[in-house]
Each structure stands twice: as structure tokens, then as C-alpha cells.
């Protein structure tokens, strides 16, 4: 699943949709596409018209399908407001009605995976600073979506931000935010969180779902960046570790010479890889 921003701004590089779709098709892997803000036609009068080029190359901007016991839904939450490059995170009434009808066919308790571009929640909301939410970085009418997903074991796959993040906005919901393969707009091999360019891998067994992060230039077993004592001048006496795609449910324990030394203390800071660019 490509969670949007398939290319750079379409108005500046209009030929790219076709070669990108051809290259992905040549891989022999089935790809499903989500519309992102960089995939919109600009300068048009409505959000519907902003998705014309996307639809010509990839089909509808919202749709659903089943694979095994899992129901997948792709939504379009990039709402173009008809001026310049401006857009907001929003699901219109037509799309919400369609989603109601689609979910009416899905038994309660089933695993549902929702793919969209703009994340449903924000760091500002999670810290209680609602007034700091930016309308183009969050799904503004997320509560409507959350209510529809209440009967299910739901996972939301989103993108838009240039970092990886995991959180549970509601007890029945788990959202996975994915950084782009372009990381910092191709200017560095790391995203804003100091994690190497890569992608999320999701494995299903019946209704069950597990996941891990796969850095493009590293084996699956590589899941963190570690800095020894003295490398981080802000914490000169500490071993510092950036755990890739960290999950709030995890406890990180450090070992020395094969012996456990106890849980590590979590803090918010800067990865040394980015500081030294």
C-alpha cells in the first residue's frame, strides 16, 4: 500500500504518475494506492477536480476489499479547498455515507485496516493542546471515523508526516504513521526522527496482525541506532538508543556483555545522526 504522495507536486512534474505506476507494476507486486496532497491537481475549483489525474492513473480515491479475514478500506482525506496549494484533512459526507454502507457488510469484531494519507490524530491533541492543531496535518472530523470503527479491531495506516509514530487514539484503534521513503525530501538518508529510510511490514494470520519496520539498507534484525557513553554531549554518561518505529507498549531493556542491565529511560530529544548532518 502506498499511503499517498506518490510523486512530488503534480503541477511541477506532471509526467511522473505514468513512469511510477509502470515501475511498480513491473515489480510483480500488487500495489494499492492512496491519494496524498502532493498528488492533487492544483488551481481547480473543487476537491473532486483536484483528484482527476490520480483517478486516471490509479482509479478511485476511496474503495474497499477483503483479503482473507481482514477488511481493507482506502480513504481520501486530502480535501482541496480550491485556492493555491491549500488543503485540510477532511472526509466529506459522500465518502462517510459510502463507508457506512461498506462497513454494514462487515461483521463486528473483524479486523479492519484503514489506509489514508493525513493522520487522524496529532501530537498537539495527545498533549491536550487542541488549539495548536493544524488543519492540514490532521483529520479534522476524525470522531465520525472513530465511531464507525468502534465495532472492530481497527488499524489505521497513515503517512504525511516525515517521521514514524504509533499510538492508540481510542481503545479499539491503533494508528501507524509512516515516514516517506524520501525521508527529508531526499536531502538525507534519515527521516525527521533519525530513522533510516524504509517501510512498514504487516503480517496477517487470520484476524491477527503483527508488524515491524524494515530499513531499506539494513537487515530486518537491525531495529535501532545506539550511541555509546560520551557520544551524546547532552547525556555524556549515558548509552543513548533511538529505537526505530517505537511503540508505546514496548519496554526497552539494555544489555552489557549479554547481561541485562534493566529498562532504559525514555526521553524526547534529537538523534545524533541528524545533528551531525
Regions found by a protein language model. Give the residues of each.
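Active-site beta-strand/loop signature of hydrolases that rely on acidic residues for catalysis
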Residues: 1-9, 36, 111
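Short acidic, glycine-rich surface-loop motifs adjacent to enzyme active sites
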Residues: 3, 106-125
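Active-site glycine-centered loops adjacent to acidic/histidine catalytic or metal-binding residues
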Residues: 4-5, 36-37, 117, 159-160
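Extended active-site neighborhood of metal-dependent phosphoesterases/phosphodiesterases
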Residues: 11-108, 127-155, 163-205, 209-212, ...
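Short, compositionally biased P/S/T/A/G/V-rich stretches that sit at domain boundaries
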Residues: 205-237
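Short edge beta-strand/loop segments characteristic of extracellular beta-sandwich folds
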Residues: 238-244
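Short proline/glycine-enriched turn/loop motifs at strand-loop junctions of beta-rich domains
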Residues: 245-249
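Conserved small/polar residues in nucleotide/adenosyl-binding loops
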Residues: 275-277
Amino acid at each position: 500500500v502506498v499511503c499517498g504522495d506518490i510523486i512530488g507536486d503534480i503541477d511541477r512534474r506532471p509526467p511522473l504518475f505514468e513512469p511510477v505506476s509502470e515501475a511498480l507494476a513491473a515489480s510483480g507486486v500488487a500495489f494499492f494506492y492512496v491519494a496524498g496532497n502532493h498528488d492533487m491537481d492544483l488551481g481547480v475549483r473543487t476537491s473532486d477536480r483536484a483528484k482527476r489525474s490520480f483517478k486516471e492513473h490509479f482509479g478511485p480515491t476511496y474503495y474497499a476489499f477483503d483479503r482473507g479475514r481482514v477488511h481493507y478500506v482506502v480513504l481520501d482525506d486530502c480535501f482541496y479547498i480550491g485556492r493555491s496549494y491549500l488543503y485540510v484533512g477532511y472526509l466529506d459526507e459522500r465518502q462517510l455515507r459510502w463507508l457506512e454502507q461498506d462497513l454494514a457488510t462487515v461483521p463486528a469484531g473483524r479486523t479492519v485496516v484503514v489506509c489514508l494519507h493525513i493522520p487522524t490524530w496529532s501530537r498537539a491533541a495527545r498533549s491536550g493542546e487542541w488549539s495548536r492543531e493544524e488543519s492540514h496535518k490532521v483529520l479534522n472530523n476524525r470522531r465520525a471515523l472513530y465511531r464507525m470503527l468502534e465495532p472492530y479491531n481497527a488499524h489505521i495506516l497513515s503517512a504525511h508526516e516525515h517521521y514514524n509514530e504509533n499510538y492508540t487514539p481510542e481503545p479499539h484503534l491503533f494508528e501507524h504513521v509512516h515516514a516517506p521513503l524520501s525521508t527529508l525530501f531526499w536531502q538525507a538518508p534519515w527521516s525527521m526522527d533519525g530513522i533510516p529510510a524504509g517501510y512498514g511490514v504487516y503480517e496477517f494470520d487470520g484476524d491477527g496482525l503483527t508488524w515491524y519496520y524494515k530499513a531499506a539498507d539494513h537487515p530486518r534484525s537491525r531495529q535501532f541506532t545506539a550511541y555509546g557513553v560520551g557520544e551524546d554531549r547532552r547525556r555524556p554518561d549515558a548509552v543513548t538508543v533511538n529505537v526505530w518505529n517505537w511503540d508505546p507498549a514496548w519496554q526497552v531493556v539494555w544489555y552489557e556483555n549479554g547481561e541485562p542491565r534493566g529498562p532504559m529511560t525514555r526521553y524526547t530529544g534529537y538523534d545524533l545522526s541528524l545533528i551531525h548532518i
